[in-house]
Structures are given as C-alpha cells and as structure tokens.
C-alpha cells in the first residue's frame, strides 16, 4: 500500500535538544543530591506530561517542593524551557515543509503542558504540518499503542500508510508494533534517505531530491 503520511517526533528530531545541565545546576544551587530535584518533582513532571495537571499547578509544586521565591521560579522555569525547546533542526524542517501537499504530515510528541504555545511561538509547528498530537493534550504518551492510532486517525490514514520518525528506540518499537513504518532518527541525511526509500518503494516518492540532505540534527 502506498505511503500517504509522514509523522515526526519533536525533541531530538525537529528540535536539536542537547542536555544543557539545567537540573544539575539547580541541584547544586539548592543543595540537593544528584537526582534529588527530579525525585521531588517526579509526580508533577509525570502529570504535566499527560495533562492531568496544569502549567500553574506545576509552578505551584515547584515553589513548594523546591522552596523557590517568585524570581527564582521565573528563572528556573525559563531555564527548563530553554533546554526543552533547544534549537530548530532547519534542514529537516525544510524537508517536512516540502512534503506537503503530496503527503499528509504530522507531529507526535511526548510533551509537557505549555509546549504547544511555546513551540508555536518559537518554530511555527502548527503551520508546518497538518496535525499535531501532544501527549499533554491527549492524556497518553509514546509508546502507548493508542497514541499511534490517534495520530493516524487525525491524519485520516492507516498505520500501514504512515512513516514515523523518532530518536527513541522504545518509541520506534511502539510504532512498529502499531503497524507504522518507523525510522530511528540519527541525523538528517540518514533519516531523509530512509524516508525517501520508503516513499519510492511505495510507488510514489517525494520528488524533492533530498536523499543526501544534511543540516542540523
């Protein structure tokens, strides 16, 4: 069956997101042992990732559990979002842009409350693809089989008609179990080359000539 849609992860794929050491710096500043910050915030991080709590709830939990005043809270949250958002993988984003209208395009992201607004402001993802499925809005996260079904339903395609690109092995494995054609992202040239091979083998091809494209990523 011909490929009709291509879906991309965000962090580590459409965004270049190296570890900036934010957690470690704040642990040192607050006198916490290694891993202590995430231990205190674990349930808030988990709730924020599937939308069971609001962004305001997260801020309140940070204030109370880390003992931050308003100025410290503002700096801490800004640090977290700077690391979360990273920088644009411009080469891949341009490739995604040119897949339309020949293919339906989507984003499937394990996210956090507030991510849609911040990523739209930074990168305009809502204008880049046809559909975005965020874990914090859908109440489930990769590799839950239901979230792969959801993105296919939103794009009005079957899983066998869909290519999915992610940098996490478990998310790639989950997509394959769900019947999607999944690619483990390593860099732009590799990922685009594998996408192009799948599109060509399905009898269509993108016609973009990006088989050896490079760029961020």
Outline where the language-model segments fall.
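Proline-centered loop/turn at the N-terminus of a beta-strand
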Residues: 104-106, 181
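Catalytic-core regions built around general acid/base machinery
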Residues: 91-102
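Generic structural signal for small/hydrophobic residues in well-ordered secondary structure
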Residues: 9-12, 51, 99, 107, ...
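N-terminal helical cap/lid subdomain that shapes the substrate entry/recognition surface
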Residues: 2-93, 112
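Asp-based, Mg2+/Mn2+-dependent phosphohydrolase catalytic module
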Residues: 1-4, 8, 112-217
């Amino acid at each position: 069956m011909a490929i009709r849609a291509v879906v991309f992860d965000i962090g580590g794929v459409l965004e270049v997101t190296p570890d900036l050491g934010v957690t470690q710096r704040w642990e040192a500043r607050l006198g916490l042992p290694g891993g202590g910050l995430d231990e205190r915030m674990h349930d808030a991080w988990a709730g924020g990732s599937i939308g069971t709590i609001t962004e305001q709830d997260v801020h309140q939990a940070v204030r109370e559990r880390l003992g931050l005043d308003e100025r410290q809270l503002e700096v801490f949250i800004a640090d977290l979002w700077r690391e979360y958002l990273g920088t644009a993988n411009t080469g891949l984003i341009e490739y995604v842009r040119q897949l339309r209208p020949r293919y339906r395009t989507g984003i499937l992201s394990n996210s956090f409350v507030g991510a849609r607004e911040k990523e739209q402001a930074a990168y305009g993802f809502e204008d880049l693809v046809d559909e975005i499925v965020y874990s914090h809005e859908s109440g489930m996260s990769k590799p839950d089989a239901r979230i792969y079904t959801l993105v296919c339903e939103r794009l009005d395609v079957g899983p066998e008609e869909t290519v999915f690109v992610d940098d996490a092995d478990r998310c790639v494995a989950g997509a394959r179990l769900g019947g999607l054609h999944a690619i483990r992202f390593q860099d732009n040239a590799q990922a685009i080359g594998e996408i192009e091979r799948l599109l060509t083998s399905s009898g269509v091809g993108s016609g973009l000539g990006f088989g050896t494209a490079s760029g961020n990523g």
